[in-house]
Amino acid sequence: MAYIEVNQNRHLQLLLNIYEAAPDGEHYTIDGIDCYLTNEPDKAYQFIVYDCGVMQTPTSIFRDADHRLLCGSVLPYEIPVFHKALSECGSLEVRPVAICVPQEIQEYCMELFGEDVQIAAASHDLFAKRANGQIYRPLVEKYIAGEKRL
């Protein structure tokens, strides 16, 4: 699996420094995930997660993806930003994933963003293998051989 940062935020560089990751060719590996600072993977992958950053308008990478997740923190003051990003996707099939939603506004978020919105728990371990598995497993289930559980 590869994680590729295709935005200008450079958050991945900060994380690589914190995790003290050493380069391996064009990527850095953290907990079995190859992380790239550029969209130039040096090998083939079954799964690639592209971090597009803040959604202004959908990028070609986002539009052409097999599965599109629009993930964003949805604290009360962030609702307009998440709503605008979702609106920018237009007719694209997108799975909205709202992160850090306080219990008090979860029902409101489902009314606003639709019943398809997934409410994800905050994961302070970016590379946690089991965090929010109920959201991500259905995306990859048909590609997994055997019964290895996330």
Give the location of each predicted region.
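Conserved beta-strand termini and adjacent loop/short-helix elements that scaffold enzyme active sites
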Residues: 4-6, 38, 52, 122
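A broad, low-specificity signal for short, low-complexity segments enriched in glycine/proline
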Residues: 9-11, 29-34, 57-61
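Generic hydrophobic, helix-prone segments enriched in Leu/Val/Ile
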Residues: 15-17, 35, 109, 135-144
